[in-house]
């Protein structure tokens, strides 16, 4: 679960972002409008830089404390304006959460303003200290795991009772971790998204986030704030963008919009709060004039298919626009309220979660209602949390935890609207003017309810859509915008032709029956009070219209809301445009929005800009179905130039839907009939159904229309079939520069629309009914999308005739602001127009534009001829009625516009009305002639096609008279024009009521301006007081400098006295020390002499003793050494003689034993020889006998002879082997003997060698001893010589000392050095050191 709490007020802007809700730790850098310490690197203007840096926070760091912090000093970029920019010192303050430092200081002010002038420091510090007391307590501990501390800290900031807090109510931007929100409300799921979130969450994550971080060129004079809270229980990546509404000095408190986006298959309730707050400090606004000004609302379309490229069109509409993401119909509920209670200013921000999710319902769609109040000052999150907890009791929310569907009870489809109404009354403050609630009536319809192909369920996504303000122009980006506009225009043509609906009364939607009773409860807002309306109404200054932005085209803040057509170009091209926009860079998006905001700031647009406002609710259904036959690659293959040009035209169209959605006043509201039919709409609410053909959509299209009493009575009175009513509702003027492209664009767009229409037959049917409720003058516009079966042709009495194939034909006149092109869906809507008081030049320009657009609306209608329109009966009345509405929408329109439209409307229907410049109307007319000819040919073909349907009737009936056909056409045209006139009358009445509401709003703005003037006076008085304080401070500074100089003089005098005393004391000490030194020297000399004599005597005695001992020791060493040498020699000689004798004896013994053994061996050899000879003789004898026997046996038996021979050969072999064995035995005997002798000899040799080695070692030892003795002898001799020399020297020194004693010169330092007491000891040391080696041998 993730949390986003972002407020921007009074030039305070801070953004909080969260990465999937893992660990939210935000680092926001404060910015000042003039005193910036954050340089804008990209040169995109001093706009808001998104400094929200998310540090990954480990789990063990979650519970650490946070404090608010801002830099110590601010660098001044420009001269300080004390009156205009007194509050500009502190802009936004940071939430820094470094991992090492979890505490932040909440000072927004210069704490170390050392770089600035002294005057600036005094005044700035004065003001900033007040703001610091007001806004930032010294330290506000914010613990992320506990919401109470946050609420207390923030409440302390916002609830300050100081005057500055009343002037500029500032709010904190706090990023709370998931623990805080879980404790605050764990079961609330809020997600701000306008369309299916699964597509945008993945494919447009970076682009949509970048839009929020776009630098805004904004004035320091006034600002609006949006408070967006975004929670997500799912594991999807949460995308939130800081929503910023910044307006110039001329912008009033504008209305807040809430649209209940019926997003199917989403498990998250949508909540987007837009808390706008004008800068109450009129004195701070340089040249502030609180006239009506345009506001920008960013429109975000649906995105469904997560596998496709997202094609969302982010467009800022001119005047007030609504976030149009409805899939079918939108209920506009407007309550223009004026709250006089001034004490509520510092209370609740107008934020509430209104989600009626029934726990028992199983409807596939989720009811997502958003709610935003207008101009409610931002307050502490403490109060917000309390309100959320209070509203929890009244609003049942089923926590889905990422389920496939967020279920809504059909019994209470819009029950939250009444709760929102109650919340409006509670949350409205002094600045609250209008509250526009756009609730979704078809919230119970799922995306897969009526589609043959299952659509992927939307995944949970959260992103806040920023509201842009005036941004500086950028010439380079303007070209890109034109190309994108043109591309989006072409895509819109291709998309609108694919809408196919098929009504059947078999299966109504689930929540359509119960919605009626609940809807009546919702529409119960109090009637606005017009008592305080004053006659003073500010007129808009003349402004130049600049190029529009594909993302933003502006609408007036008080234009009446109405239902937009499903096929309105303001909404239909948005999915395709987003597909193109995803390719673009973040910088392009930022710069586009900057240019559009600058355009909105400078252009002059009357409030009478009227669009087909039902586009805002209905387009996500049909425009996306229109894409069914358009391949995805084809949408993306358009070149950059085509994309830019299409987007430029679409921005003007989208302004109409926004204007209609926002300018609805207290009375305008949509009945429950609308929500029921929206719930029974056959169109799936999938935001991206481009891959599905219209045929597949037709298969499961189920519609069961419902009507309320007022509507049915009116239809019965008009005698019309309510199911087939086709009426042109809106033609509204727009400035020529904003809405009219060149004729070349017209030609391209017409051709593109014709091509798309020719290949895509679409069937649509819309009924628009008007109902007035009570005295509030509510406009009830209901759109029902349905298509009759092809077999049964139907005739619409109100709107004309249907074709024999059952295709209703509707005429769509183009709105002058660019939303009039309603191609190929034939789903017209009725929009309401509202004229507000404007300057004479603006009225004239709008009238001239109206006349041009009315002609264009008829001239460009012939491109629908390729759409198989069977009869001209159905066409002529519709187009004529469209021209009439164009004429009647402005009271003082030119008469030529009506004439031109009536002459051209013969055989035309407006599939896409593309505004062109008045100069370029010639080529457009020439093109329309060709289109008319083609449409006539198509009509004939269609007539031929219809003939086989009734072959029997054609054969029996006579041919139809052409005059009667013309007569019926004229009757149908007249009937349609009557209906149009009645509709226009109703529009006029409703617009009058809306104008009254606008007067209330303007009066409120005037009151606020007066209050701000009072506050400015108070601030100027305070500034004068501060200047007086500055003068006092300067006087006190001079006085302190004088006192300082006096103190310095006194200090110098005292220092001089102290120095003199010090010198006197030093001289006294020197004299005393000299006297003391002389006395001590005399004493030391006497002591030294006595001690020297003692030491001399002692040393002499020691030297004598040493000499005697040394001589005795030397003699003893010499005698002992001689004796040892003699003994060693004798021992060596004895050992040698013994060894020689032993060796001789052993040699003799060995020789004797050898000789004996040799004799014995010889004897044995002789004996063996004798034995051998005897054996040989025996063998010879035996052989002779054998021979004799052989001879005998040969004679007897040859076998026996053979055996005898074999025996003889074997005996010979045995003898040979025996001889060899004897020889080997002899050799073995000899070897054994040799081995024995060798072993004995080896042992003897080893013994002899050991003895020799021992003798050698002894000899070596003897030699070493002899050498050692010789060296010791030499050392002793040397030591004796040294001692003799030392004795001589000592004697000499003794003589010198005696001489000195006699002469008395011991005190002289030069003479004392040779007779120092340490010198006599050296001879003794030397003698001791030399005598020590003599002792060591012992």
Curated annotation (Swiss-Prot):
One of its GO terms (cellular component) is chromosome. Keywords: Cell cycle, Chromosome, Coiled coil, Cytoplasm, Cytoskeleton, Microtubule, Nucleus, Ubl conjugation pathway. It is found in: Nucleus; Cytoplasm, Cytoskeleton; Chromosome; Midbody. GO terms for biological process: regulation of macrophage chemotaxis. Residues 561-573, 646-661 have a biased composition (Low complexity). GO terms for molecular function: microtubule binding; protein kinase binding. Residues 731-774 form the F-box domain. Present in egg (at protein level). Belongs to the MTUS1 family. Regulates microtubule dynamics during mitosis by stimulating kif2c. Probably recognizes and binds to some phosphorylated proteins and promotes their ubiquitination and degradation. This is Microtubule-associated tumor suppressor 1 homolog. It comes from Xenopus laevis. The gene is mtus1.
């Amino acid at each position: 679960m993730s949390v986003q709490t972002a407020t921007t007020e009074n030039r305070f802007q801070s953004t909080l972002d969260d990465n999937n809700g893992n660990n939210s730790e935000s680092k926001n850098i404060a910015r000042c409008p003039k005193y910036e310490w954050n340089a804008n690197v990209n040169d995109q203007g001093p706009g808001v830089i998104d400094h929200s840096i998310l540090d990954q926070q480990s789990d063990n760091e979650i519970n650490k404390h946070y404090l608010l912090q801002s830099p110590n000093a601010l660098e001044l970029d420009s001269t300080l304006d004390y009156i205009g920019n007194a509050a500009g010192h502190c802009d936004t303050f940071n939430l820094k959460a470094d991992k090492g430092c979890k505490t932040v200081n909440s000072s927004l002010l210069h704490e170390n303003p050392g770089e600035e002038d002294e005057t600036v420091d005094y005044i700035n510090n004065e003001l900033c200290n007040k703001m610091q007391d007001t806004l930032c307590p010294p330290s506000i501990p914010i613990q992320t795991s506990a919401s109470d501390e946050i609420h207390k800290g923030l409440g302390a900031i916002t609830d300050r009772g100081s005057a500055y807090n009343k002037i500029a109510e500032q709010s904190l931007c706090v990023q709370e971790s998931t623990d805080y929100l879980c404790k605050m409300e764990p079961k609330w799921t809020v997600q701000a998204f306008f369309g299916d979130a699964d597509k945008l969450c993945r494919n447009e994550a970076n682009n949509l986030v970048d839009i929020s971080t776009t630098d805004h060129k904004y004035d320091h004079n006034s600002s609006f704030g949006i408070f967006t809270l975004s929670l997500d229980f799912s594991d999807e990546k949460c995308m939130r963008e800081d929503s910023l509404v910044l307006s110039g000095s001329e912008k009033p408190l504008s209305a807040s919009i809430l649209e209940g986006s019926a997003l199917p298959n989403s498990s998250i309730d949508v909540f987007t709060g837009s808390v706008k707050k004008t800068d109450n400090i009129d004195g701070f606004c340089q040249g502030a004039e609180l006239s009506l000004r345009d506001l920008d609302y960013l429109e975000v379309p649906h995105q469904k298919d997560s596998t496709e490229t997202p094609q969302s069109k982010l467009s800022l509409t001119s005047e007030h626009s609504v976030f149009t993401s409805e899939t079918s119909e939108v209920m506009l509920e407007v309550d223009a309220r004026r709250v006089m209670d001034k004490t509520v200013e510092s209370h609740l921000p107008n934020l509430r979660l209104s989600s009626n999710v029934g726990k028992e319902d199983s409807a596939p769609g989720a009811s997502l209602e958003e709610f935003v109040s207008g101009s409610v000052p931002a307050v502490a999150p403490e109060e917000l949390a309390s309100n959320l907890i209070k509203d929890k009791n009244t609003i049942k929310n089923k926590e889905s935890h990422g389920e496939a569907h967020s279920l809504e009870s059909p019994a209470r489809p819009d029950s939250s609207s009444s709760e929102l109404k109650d919340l409006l009354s509670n949350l409205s403050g002094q600045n609250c003017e209008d509250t526009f609630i756009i609730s979704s009536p078809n919230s119970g319809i799922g995306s897969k309810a009526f589609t043959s192909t299952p659509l992927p369920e939307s995944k949970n996504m959260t992103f806040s859509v920023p509201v842009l303000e005036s941004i500086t122009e950028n010439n380079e980006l303007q070209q890109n915008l034109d190309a994108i506009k043109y591309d989006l225009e072409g895509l819109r043509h291709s998309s609108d032709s694919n809408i196919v609906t098929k009504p059947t009364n078999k299966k109504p939607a689930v929540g359509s029956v119960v919605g009626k009773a609940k809807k009546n409860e919702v529409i119960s807002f109090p009637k606005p009070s017009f008592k305080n309306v004053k006659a003073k109404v500010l007129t808009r200054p003349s402004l130049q219209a600049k190029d529009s932005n594909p993302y933003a085209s502006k609408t007036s803040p008080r234009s009446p809301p109405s239902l937009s057509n499903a096929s309105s170009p303001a909404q239909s091209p948005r999915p395709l445009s987003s597909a193109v926009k995803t390719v673009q860079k973040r910088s392009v998006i930022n710069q586009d929005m900057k240019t559009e905001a600058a355009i909105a700031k400078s252009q002059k647009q009357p409030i009478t800009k009227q669009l087909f406002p039902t586009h805002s609710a209905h387009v996500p259904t049909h425009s996306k179905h229109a894409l069914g036959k358009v391949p995805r690659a084809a949408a993306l293959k358009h070149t950059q130039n085509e994309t830019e040009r299409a987007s430029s035209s679409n921005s003007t169209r989208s302004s109409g839907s926004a204007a209609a959605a926002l300018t609805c006043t207290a009375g305008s509201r949509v009945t429950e009939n609308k929500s029921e039919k929206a719930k029974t709409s056959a169109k799936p609410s999938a935001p991206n159904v481009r891959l599905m053909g219209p045929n597949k959509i037709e298969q499961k299209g189920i519609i069961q229309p419902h009507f309320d009493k007022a509507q049915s009575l009116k239809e019965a009175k008009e005698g019309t079939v309510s199911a087939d009513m086709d009426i042109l509702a809106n033609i509204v003027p727009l400035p020529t520069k904003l809405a009219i492209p060149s004729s070349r664009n017209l030609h391209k767009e017409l051709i593109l629309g014709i091509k798309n229409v020719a290949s895509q037959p679409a069937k649509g049917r819309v009924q628009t009914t008007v109902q007035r409720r009570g005295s509030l003058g509510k406009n009830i516009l209901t759109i029902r999308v349905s298509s009759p079966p092809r077999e049964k042709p139907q005739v619409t009495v109100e709107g004309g005739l249907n074709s024999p194939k059952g295709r209703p034909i509707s005429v769509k006149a183009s709105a002058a602001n660019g939303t009039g092109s309603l191609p190929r869906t034939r789903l017209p809507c009725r929009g309401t127009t509202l004229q507000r008081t404007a300057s004479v030049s603006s009225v004239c320009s709008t009238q001239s534009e109206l006349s041009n657009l009315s002609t264009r609306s008829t001239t460009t209608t012939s491109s629908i001829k390729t759409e198989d329109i069977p009869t001209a009966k159905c066409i002529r009345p519709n187009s004529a009625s469209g021209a009439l509405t164009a004429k009647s929408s402005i009271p003082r329109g030119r008469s030529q516009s009506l004439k031109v439209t009536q002459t051209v409307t013969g055989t035309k229907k407006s599939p896409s009305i593309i505004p062109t410049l008045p100069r370029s109307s010639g080529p457009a007319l020439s093109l329309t002639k060709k289109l008319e000819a083609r449409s006539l040919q198509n009509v004939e073909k269609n007539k031929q096609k219809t003939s086989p349907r009734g072959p029997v009737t054609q054969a029996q009936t006579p041919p139809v008279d052409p005059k009667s056909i013309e007569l019926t056409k004229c009757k149908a045209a007249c009937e349609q024009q009557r209906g149009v006139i009645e509709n226009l009358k109703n529009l006029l009445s409703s617009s009058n009521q809306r104008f009254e509401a606008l007067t209330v709003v303007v009066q409120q703005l005037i009151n606020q301006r007066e209050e701000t003037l009072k506050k400015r006076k108070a601030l100027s008085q305070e500034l004068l007081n501060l200047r007086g304080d500055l003068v006092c401070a300067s006087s006190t500074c001079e006085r302190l400098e004088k006192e300082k100089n006096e103190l310095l003089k006194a200090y110098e005098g005292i220092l001089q006295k102290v120095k003199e005393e010090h010198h006197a004391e030093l001289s006294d000490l020197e004299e005393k020390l000299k006297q003391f030194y002389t006395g001590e020297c005399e004493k030391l000399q006497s002591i030294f002499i006595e001690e020297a004599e003692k030491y001399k005597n002692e040393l002499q005695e020691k030297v004598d003793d040493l000499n005697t001992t040394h001589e005795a020791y030397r003699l003893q060493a010499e005698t002992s050494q001689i004796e040892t040498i003699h003994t060693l020699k004798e021992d060596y000689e004895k050992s040698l003689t013994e060894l020689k004798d032993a060796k001789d004896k052993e040699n003799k013994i060995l020789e004797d034993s050898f000789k004996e053994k040799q004799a014995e061996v010889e004897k044995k050899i002789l004996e063996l020889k004798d034995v051998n000879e005897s054996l040989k003789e025996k063998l010879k004898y035996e052989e002779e006998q054998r021979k004799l026997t052989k001879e005998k046996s040969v004679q007897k038996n040859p076998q026996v002879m053979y055996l005898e021979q074999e025996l003889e050969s074997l005996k010979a072999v045995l003898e040979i082997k025996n001889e060899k064995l004897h020889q080997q035995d002899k050799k073995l005997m000899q070897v054994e003997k040799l081995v024995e002798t060798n072993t004995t000899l080896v042992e003897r040799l080893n013994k002899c060698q050991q003895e020799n080695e021992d003798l050698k070692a002894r000899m070596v030892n003897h030699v070493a001893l002899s050498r050692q003795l010789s060296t010791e002898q030499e050392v002793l001799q040397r030591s004796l010589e040294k001692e003799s020399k030392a004795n001589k020297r000592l004697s000499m020194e003794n003589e010198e000392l005696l001489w000195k004693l006699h002469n008395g010169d011991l005190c002289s330092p030069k003479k004392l050095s040779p007779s120092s007491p340490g010198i006599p000891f050296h001879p003794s040391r030397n003698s001791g050191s030399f005598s020590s080696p003599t002792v060591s041998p012992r």
